[in-house]
UniProtKB/Swiss-Prot annotation:
Originating species: Shewanella baltica (strain OS185)
BP GO terms, sorted: DNA recombination; DNA repair
Similarity-based family: Belongs to the RecR family.
Superkingdom assignment: Bacteria
Zinc finger residue extent: C4-type: 57-72
Domain Toprim stretches: 81-176
Keywords noted in UniProt: DNA damage, DNA recombination, DNA repair, Metal-binding, Zinc, Zinc-finger
Xref: Pfam families: RecR_C, RecR_HhH, RecR_ZnF, Toprim_4
Keyword flag Metal-binding: yes
GO molecular function: DNA binding; zinc ion binding
Gene3D superfamilies found in the cross-reference section: 3.40.1360.10, 6.10.250.240, RecR Domain 1 (1.10.8.420)
Keyword DNA repair: yes
Protein name according to UniProt: Recombination protein RecR
Record gene name: recR
Length: 199
């Protein structure tokens, strides 16, 4: 059944969100129209502002509405000689939530995937190479995902960093804290054994 054209457009627009199918989009639209129009207007305003004003940091490529994100603009962290390379801005938030990393970031906005047409240019690796060539980077921490594409991306970047004589490290992969061995997949378990540390 078709509703009004505006309602149909709202439902179809909500479907662009990950994990939102036709029924979920319809429920969201009805919720906003029937019970929470004020929140709907606030959502529309925030979405409009974010779409027009949020761009990428000129240094690390994470999301910001300024030229530099707060980390790169910080006098303490923006001059750190340690850069952590991640695939997405969400990875930055995850690492920041841990509160243990005090350096700066470089966000790839993806990973190498030749079949999908994603090469070094799409990941901004020319900008990363400029950072490495500047002489201001002592260590590059590779925190790409432990997938085939993430590993290939990490190896490509490691080769680039070696040319600039920058120390390279890779975040550890293994058994999660609180995890039980019987539920850990064999690849993760192998990585845990290969990356074991002395006590």
């Amino acid at each position: 059944m078709k509703f009004s054209p505006l309602l149909d457009e709202l439902i179809q627009s909500l479907r662009c969100l990950p994990g939102v199918g036709p029924k979920s989009a319809q429920r969201m639209a009805f919720q906003l129209l029937e019970r929470d129009r004020k929140a709907g207007l606030k959502l529309a305003s925030a979405l409009s502002s974010a779409m027009s004003d949020v761009g990428h940091c000129q240094s690390c490529r994470t999301y910001t509405e300024e030229t530099l994100c707060p980390i790169c603009a910080s006098h303490k962290r923006g001059t750190s000689s340690t850069i952590c390379v991640v695939e997405t801005p969400a990875d930055v938030l995850a690492i920041e939530a841990g509160g243990h990393f005090t350096g700066r970031y470089f966000v790839l906005l993806g990973h190498l995937s030749p079949l999908d047409g994603v090469g070094p240019e799409e990941l901004g690796l020319a900008l990363l190479e400029r950072h490495l060539a500047s002489g201001d980077v002592a260590e590059l921490i590779l925190a790409t995902n432990p997938t085939v594409e993430g590993e290939a991306t990490a190896h490509f970047i490691a080769d680039m960093a070696r040319r600039h004589k920058v120390m390279i490290s890779r975040i550890a992969h293994g058994v999660p804290v609180g995890g039980e061995l019987e539920y850990v997949d064999s690849t993760t378990l192998a990585l845990s054994f290969n990356g074991r540390l002395p006590l």
